[in-house]
Amino acid sequence: MDRLRLPTLPRRTFIEVMVGGLLAAPRAADAQQPRVYRVGVVLQGGPYLGAVDGLRKGLAELGLEEGKQVVLHVRDGKGDLKAVEQAAGDLEREKVDLIYSVATSVTLAVKQATKKVPIVFNTGNDPVTFGLVQSFRKPGGRLTGTFSRSTDLIGKRLELLKEMVPRLRRVVTFYNPDTPSSELRMKVARDAARQLKVELLARRVASVEELRAGLRALRTGEADAYCSTADATVISQTALIIDTARAKKLPTMFIEQESVTQGGLASYGVSYSAIGRLSARYVQQILLGAHPGDLPVEQIDRFYFVINLKTAKALGLTIPQSLLQRADEVIACPEKADASRGC
């Protein structure tokens, strides 16, 4: 009986088929890999880094885990707006999917340095006033995010500081006159100080180096306390401010609760960790196809009053019980101390 003979391929054709199959296999595997999104983060360091931690947590809760579904490219300007602009331009050229910016001056710099990349921001000043969006409800353009009213709360911080430091007569603050929001912030601060009958010692510092020099030059007893006015250049050096205040026995009032956990006396304002967590929703929606201009800006109305009793004790301050009861968080005294008496 004749054997059944199967058709055979010419040798050259056989090799081409085999090689083609081997090359196609990796392509098929690649096609099944989920997309990894790339998110640039631009800020000025210091307490602002809390927003990065919050962003990571928020994205993970939304199913975007860092290192798996998303990669964060964090750029710290360390108080230098030129470094911020450079970082933003570099990130766009590296084709990140989105940039997350923290602080008004940083967001303005990021917008200026980029052309197409979507931007999710947190600002302490009205984003409409500063031309970042057209309106809260319909931002338009490629920017959206959150607004935390840090400038509006300067008066409240001074008021709380005066309650904690009854002898308060002179308050020192530092600000960078080159930041776009400096004029507005200092007007709010001066008006509030005038109403509280407190002298505001406003020191101009155009760079981190000038701030460091200004802190070194501050004489013990020259001021009765320090109050932050939401300047990003200054906030980037919060650790140095806290160290200087400790050495000069100077009570401090900050914006963000992260500064109090580092040793500041008190804060009234935002939690950057909470802001980052909230911002993750915007980031997720844009990565999945939403247009920034269609996502309404959210105004943050949750503020935290935090007191560090350990710092109060070191300063020899007794915090009134009425203030302790109003605080959202009190960092406790050492064991066996009477917290109700301010340690």
Where are these regions (language model features)?
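Short hydrophobic alpha-helices and adjacent helix-cap/hinge residues
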Residues: 1-343
